[in-house]
Amino acid sequence: MNLFRSKPKPQPPPKVPSDEVIPLHYLDDQFYTRALVLHFFSRFDDVLDPEKLRSALDRLLQIGGWRKLGARLRLNDAGGLEYHVPAEYTAERPPFSFTRVNTGISIEDHYIARRIPRNSSGSQKPVLFEDAANFSDLIYSPDTPTKLEDWLYTDKPPLFLHIVTFTDATVVGFSWSHTLLDAMGRHLLQRAWTAVLEGREQDVPPFRGYHEDPITPVIDQTPPEQYVLYDHLLRGFGFLMFVMYMILEFVWWPRQSSRIILLPGPYIQNLRQQALQDLQEQQQKSETNEPAPFVSEGDIIFAWLAKKTLQALGTNPSTPVNLTLILNLRGNSALASAFPPGEAYIGNASLASTTLTTAREILHQPLSQTAARIRRDLEIQRTPENIRACLSLHRREVRSTGRSPLFGPGNQLMLSLSNWHRGRFFEQDFSAAAVADGVRKGGGDDSDSDRPLKTTPTRAEQIGRPSFVGVTGHENGFRVRNAGPCLGRDARGDWWVSWALRDEAWGDFL
């Protein structure tokens, strides 16, 4: 009887002596990066040549330090993650996994792909679409990893490219562990991939941080106590209270889902113009010589999401609220030596900007005030002094508690946005792989492959650029709720967001 025999502990593949072993950089080996597997996808209303895309990515991962993106992921004896970079890539150990499906039908005849969101009706108001997870069968192959262990105990490469072709469109799926890269790292990879695709290898930037972690020298330059939010650090009993509230949230409302949200360009532009006007009038009434606060579309979108989320949840006005905005470190003067211009750092390089407020302020004050607070806190917290102090605090807290620092009271409600607009994912240019455009009804089959490629009045995006981008993923060990990414702005000027809530709240969101 073996009823009580435990499963044997999984074992990694045998070490390959010729592999180069490189420990993961500090921000790459964190609890949340280990927990998240991302599946990014793009719909192109053109027929793309999968082999051209595959061969360009394959060539990129043979160039200099870019080879590191094909490294195998392993645990060392101390429990830390490390890369094992093959001395050479072969058919048995490729730099990435590639799968393709040729459906032979129009995208409008495919039971899943035809539901990929579009603003086909020209809506001028926000619209909710289904969860991107519903497209999983289209985005990645069954062999694609969904958790870190799927890499640790196999010899699978880090990147998985899955391409589905139709007679008039193409869907490109791209999967990876968050330990490999963040959103802006994905953007830099995208640009280098396009350069190779277009025959511009000379434009592929040098790979930054192959061996050494460029961020590590900056850590501990400034004492953690100098961080502007240090006195609001969540710890001790406050942190235990925060965890208890999170547990109760998932006990009472165990089901959650994400929705893709369309925010029409004119709608967001009107909200922003009204906010700027409100702030200008407020500034004039204050009789100071300071300029009126600036707010971006991203600030407006986060403020709008916060208000809609609190309304949908029926949040008590007295509830403290933490608005967390993911902060990209590339380009910050505090890390000028870490990220020299012209070089590509692909790994994780993000912290967070935090706005501490209340549900009452978000629900009852004009949108302009919340957006201005988000912008003000971002500007303060990304100064060189605060970035250096936050990095020092981050490492101190990870070493002492095993988690990233959080700020605010224990009974707070936390909302988090990652703005991917700077990644320009809607501007990804695969035109060099385009065989035929598929904008016309019935177009895009083999007989049309020699027709001229051109943008027509029925489409806004240029040839070889996506009409939609989206993301889904697998969360292991924790769940992301009241959070998500702003996917960016499409060629029509419309904004797209993926947002996660408890299921019961979606009926009251809009």
Predicted regions and their residues:
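Short, structured protein-protein interaction patches enriched in aromatics and acidic/basic residues
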Residues: 71-91, 325-333, 391-418
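Non-catalytic N-terminal regions of enzymes
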Residues: 1-221, 273, 297-317, 416-420, ...
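Eukaryotic cytosolic low-complexity regulatory segments
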Residues: 241-244, 375, 379-382, 386-393, ...
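Helical lid/core segments from catalytic subdomains that handle acyl or acyl-like groups
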Residues: 279-286, 344-453
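Hydrophobic "lid/gating" helix adjacent to the active-site nucleophile
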Residues: 65, 283-338
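Flexible, P/S/T/G-rich "lid" or insertion loops adjacent to the active sites of thioester-utilizing
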Residues: 225-292
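Acyl/amide activation-and-transfer machinery of modular secondary-metabolite enzymes
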Residues: 33-42, 80-119, 252-258, 329-373
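Short Gly/Pro-enriched turn/cap motifs at secondary-structure boundaries
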Residues: 150-153, 251-252, 405-407
